[in-house]
């Protein structure tokens, strides 16, 4: 359905977020601070996670391969099966994937199994396989967002890479697929310790990639979890993100209404112009119009076109419009 831009609020947008960092930094704990998370343990590493952290999840699943994950989430299901999946997931608001690197690996295995052209003899993906993997990752996110109506948070481990004398930090993922991951994310944060404080950075720097939008940027401290304090950092961040979106939409609607009023007023004035006297009489009122967006430029173009049509020019010496002198024949 086509809608006007000013009517798009994005106030309840489902957010796609990437969390990157070294093992042990607390990525899973942070991811489970999202609203009502379903923890999808693709790494099969839940037994290594502190029980108190696991208890933060509303539910846990450990798919052994991408086929099982597709069934769990209703990917490729018929309408009846998809409705059953949606019903089973109704109590969850966020899908947490741990880890994204392993998700891409089992996706690649699924692709090679179903189409030998996607694989090479050494077991790695072919060029065509990587192309499919990027599209499948996008389809996976779209399904979680648009079909299941969930936020999605994907955890990635980090690896160090040498770039000349510098050491860069990059997400750990199979081949070129890691470059496609960032494109589809709304937020991407890199976790690290600064002194004794855990932080997450949402702005690119010389050491790592990150992504911030809707007022989410820079480095944020992550509160230390203590008894009695709720683990809700991402819940509050998502609320802030959508609140900014709602405020932007509100301002856009107000600006559009102001623009429409300005253009209507300008056209009303211009339609009444017939000669130099009427133009000069209307100039002050025209200049007093309260503009928004591009109304000043657009109405100015209409004014200039009308005065040219009437054969008028602005005389800077006299400070008013006068008939243009006819050229001698």
Write out the residue ranges for each language-model feature:
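Active-site-proximal flexible loops/turns
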Residues: 48-50, 105-109, 193
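Interfaces that engage single-stranded nucleic acids at replication/repair/recombination sites
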Residues: 9-18, 25, 33-34, 44, ...
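Conserved P-loop
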Residues: 2, 7, 11-84, 88-97, ...
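A general structural signal for short secondary-structure junctions and capping/turn motifs
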Residues: 9, 29-31, 86-88, 143-145, ...
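Eukaryote-biased recognition of electropositive, low-complexity segments
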Residues: 192-261
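Phosphate-binding/switch region of NTP-binding enzymes
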Residues: 22, 146-223
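P-loop NTPase motor core
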Residues: 99-180
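Surface-exposed alpha-helical segments enriched in charged/polar residues
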Residues: 71-74, 139-142, 146, 271
